[in-house]
Amino acid sequence: MYIEMVDETGQVSKEMLQQTQEILEFAAQKLGKEDKEMAVTFVTNERSHELNLEYRNTDRPTDVISLEYKPELEIAFDEEDLLENSELAEMMSEFDAYIGELFISIDKAHEQAEEYGHSFEREMGFLAVHGFLHINGYDHYTPEEEAEMFGLQEEILTAYGLTRQ
């Protein structure tokens, strides 16, 4: 999985960037999404607040903002067209590969790690996996959706080795 990572805060260590990359690759493998692409940007609470207003019309910062990529334009080609035109086939493959982007608030991650009594590493892993599941169609609006998403989230974190301490 290709993951573009940007640290707007200047506060994310190389180790944390590596952990984020690894846990997202691990989650992608669990969901069969190894061939996908995404972006992760680490932000401050101030930037999270701005993004939350812009994309969700919510006037506060949040821990992770997940923007699932859903192209507005449906492009359909016959399989024959793709077989005959390798450039078109490659372009469509790249078009289908991008699944979305996450904005993770470093400030919120620190606050929540302290509040929930676990490590910053666990919280960052949790936020990355939580956001990843959102951009792959999982949600928690109903009790059934919540049970499915949170169960999968905990399964991934535990299998990766980030348990609650």
Curated annotation (Swiss-Prot):
EC code(s) of this entry: 3.1.-.-
Localization terms from the record: Cytoplasm
Coiled-coil ranges from the UniProt annotation: none
Superkingdom to which the source organism belongs: Bacteria
Cofactor dependency: Zn(2+)
Cofactor binding remark: Binds 1 zinc ion.
Gene Ontology cellular component terms for the protein in this record: cytoplasm
HAMAP family per the UniProt record, alphabetical: Endoribonucl_YbeY
PANTHER family xref list: ENDORIBONUCLEASE YBEY, CHLOROPLASTIC
Name of protein: Endoribonuclease YbeY
Organism in which the protein naturally occurs: Streptococcus pneumoniae serotype 4 (strain ATCC BAA-334 / TIGR4)
